[in-house]
Amino acid sequence: MKFRREGIVIDAIQLNRGNIAKVCDFLGIPDMGNSWRTMNPLRIDVETPEGTTKANELDWIIRGVEGEYYTCEPDIFEQNYEKED
């Protein structure tokens, strides 16, 4: 989905148990099937410019304008981004 912050449009996806395959596709990593779905708590490694970080369930994963990835907690994401039509 597309979101906007201060005029800049980015792609982002929220990590949850119902969209793990889409998150893996978004990140360009293999979907490990049921091993993701049974992980408790749900976490996924995300390669960011600062190194590997973990995205927790309900965190947003943002793809920046140069293709880089960032993670963002849900409350911070909602304060800073709005859905692009």
Regions inferred by a protein language model and the residue ranges of each:
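Short, compact, well-ordered microdomains
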Residues: 50-85
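N-terminal domain-onset segments
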Residues: 1-49
